[in-house]
Amino acid sequence: ETNKKGRTRKDHGAEKRLVVAGFRVVDRGIHAPYTHIPMSESATMDVSDLVKEMGKRAQNAARELAILSTDQKNAALGTLADLLLERSDLILAENRKDLQRAEKNGISGALYDRLKLTPERIRNMAEGVRDVISLPDPVGEEIERLKPRAGLDIRKVRVPLGVVGIIYESRPNVTIDCAILCLKSGNATLLRG
């Protein structure tokens, strides 16, 4: 399949191989070949080197995300919504560990509540993903067209930014919200929450 820029795009199916916000969905598991840096490696890296490396990997992911079709992005989002529900027990178990660490570190009650996931919150997150699927794809949308002189045709078209960095605190649902909006708009994202 060829996109608007004439680049060839391989469609391996959402559940086989699809780049998703810097991650690959492979047989319904998520792997991060672009942005993921193993803990053993990141523990020995200087913070500025770590951030630079993550940025490089995100830029590589951004190139692939920018050329995904609407169907590919929506399929990936659908897979994410399904996985949130299918793996909610695992997500809740990991969240309990986060909550225990937060308590040991003396987190405030308000931050604790924001960090805490419940089955209902996970269902709401999955529903939010499905809501984004129903939104029109902004990539390639013509937002303005001018013909000032004979032969000139000027168009303003929405394109992905590339890599979006977002910093927030203690909100697992914000992780999903940011990732899905960046994916829908064809952008890679670096999240710090």
What do the predicted segments below correspond to?
Residues 25-27:
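Short, strongly patterned local motifs
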Residues 38-153:
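N-terminal Rossmann-like NAD(P)+-binding subdomain of aldehyde/semialdehyde dehydrogenases
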Residues 134, 138-193:
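Conserved small-residue-rich beta-alpha loop and adjacent elements
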